[in-house]
């Protein structure tokens, strides 16, 4: 990135050599005043953009931290959830087997 060669103060304090048929001093001064205003605008715009850039970088950093925290929270919950589903399925299978065994055992006793 190219650096700025002149500050508004440098432009304001610039002295030009005068010659017999030189430029109109008033016209040069007005032009330089316009350039100074432009430079001041550029400098303030650059500063605003730097501040916005810093703010946005901080927001991205915070968002990444929140995302990582959410991931660490979701991961254990997901594993607990999947283990509960497996446990529930296993318990259900056990209850079905017990029910069949009871029917076999107690069903025969009732008929006898």
Swiss-Prot record:
Record GO cellular component, one term: cytoplasm
GO BP: any one term: regulation of cell shape
Coiled coil ranges: 32-75
Disulfide bridges in this chain: none
Matches recorded under Pfam families: DivIVA
Superkingdom of origin: Bacteria
Keywords from the UniProt entry: Cell cycle, Cell division, Cell shape, Coiled coil, Cytoplasm
Family: Belongs to the GpsB family.
Physiological role: Divisome component that associates with the complex late in its assembly, after the Z-ring is formed, and is dependent on DivIC and PBP2B for its recruitment to the divisome. Together with EzrA, is a key component of the system that regulates PBP1 localization during cell cycle progression. Its main role could be the removal of PBP1 from the cell pole after pole maturation is completed. Also contributes to the recruitment of PBP1 to the division complex. Not essential for septum formation.
The protein's name: Cell cycle protein GpsB
Organism: Streptococcus mutans serotype c (strain ATCC 700610 / UA159)
Name of encoding gene: gpsB
């Amino acid at each position: 990135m190219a650096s700025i060669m002149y500050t508004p103060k440098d432009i304001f304090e610039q002295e030009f050599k005068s010659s017999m048929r030189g430029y109109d001093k008033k016209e040069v001064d007005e032009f330089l005043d316009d350039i100074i205003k432009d430079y001041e605008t550029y400098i303030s715009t650059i500063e605003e953009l730097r501040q916005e850039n810093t703010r946005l970088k901080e927001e991205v950093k915070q968002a990444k931290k929140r995302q990582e925290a959410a991931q660490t929270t979701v991961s254990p919950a997901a594993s607990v959830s999947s283990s509960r589903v497996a446990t529930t399925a296993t318990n259900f299978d056990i209850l079905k087997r017990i029910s069949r065994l009871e029917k076999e055992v107690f069903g025969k006793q009732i008929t006898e």
